[in-house]
Amino acid sequence: MKTSPHRNTSAIVDLKAIRNNIEKFKKHINPNAEIWPAVKADAYGHGSIEVSKAVSDLVGGFCVSNLDEAIELRNHLVTKPILVLSGIVPEDVDIAAALNISLTAPSLEWLKLVVQEEAELSDLKIHIGVDSGMGRIGIRDVEEANQMIELADKYAINFEGIFTHFATADMADETKFKNQQARFNKIMAGLSRQPKFIHSTNTAAALWHKEQVQAIERLGISMYGLNPSGKTLELPFEIEPALSLVSELTHIKKIAAGETVGYGATYETSEETWIGTVPIGYADGWTRQMQGFKVLVDGKFCEIVGRVCMDQMMIKLDKSYPLGTKVTLIGRDKANEITTTDVADWRGTINYEVLCLLSDRIKRIYK
């Protein structure tokens, strides 16, 4: 989807806020650990290239989801180490090796396919993934891990790291977290040899389980200023949201009592009402569930009325406003604020999803 630069709907990204959030984490975590920010999914909607360049001097490397995301960073002259967190097809490992991109090795079966595909593997770096209870990818016992290490050594593959991912580090009940931690530690204790990087700390673990000593801290959602638990757990220090979402009024009208607004005629006015149209819709990631939610106009809350359309939505105004008046969907306007977590709670989802659904059609403005 193409960005729409001629439409005044924008995600404003504060790169200084992201840098400040990283600096606060550096004071909170093990001082010997490297921070490797997660810039996957276009840096959670903030812009992976711009974010990576803005924070490169503060971090040891970057984490992405797939090989294409890593290649994009390399193509834009991001030179720090990059780790692909998901498995890739074995026939593409030569691309990763040539670009100095580290790969997740999710299983012995995958590694066997890699050595069958490629004759020269000395430039390949792998991090063995451990499934300690997430149930996604990774090995589940030390025997498989040691077989992978042996196979890597045989073909001169660089066994650079090993890691796991916690499923419940952002929850008050620590039972599952401690079970995963114990499983991972047991596998680490049984390895035939230790790699350069052992890492299990995601954002939530870095915030609420900082007793872990890790070589890498994989920093995600809180780098962008959001609480990974939503509102469940209190943050140990303040962070600043880096993204605000704004648009404008493109049409304003007064309609009579008894008129309807939007597809399905789901909203009917009970009195004469000022209605404003805003150029954002579900094609931009502002989903249909947002009907009934509020936005800010001149610092005042205004209800979204009628169904959110593909490209536009309508809001109930307290009075007439000039065309071009700013509408804040996420962010602060005067004394009031709408957070990404507020939007997530309304939708019954998580703040991560709200950010990641903001489509490329919304232009990003960096400050």
Swiss-Prot record:
It catalyses: L-alanine = D-alanine. GO terms for cellular component: cytosol. GO terms for molecular function: alanine racemase activity; pyridoxal phosphate binding. The modification N6-(pyridoxal phosphate)lysine is found at K40. Substrate binds at R136, M310. Its cofactor is pyridoxal 5'-phosphate. Its EC number is 5.1.1.1. The active site is at K40 (proton acceptor), Y263 (proton acceptor). Pathway: Amino-acid biosynthesis; D-alanine biosynthesis; D-alanine from L-alanine: step 1/1. It is an enzyme of class 5 (isomerase). Belongs to the alanine racemase family. Catalyzes the interconversion of L-alanine and D-alanine. May also act on other amino acids. This is Alanine racemase. It comes from Lactococcus lactis subsp. cremoris (strain MG1363).
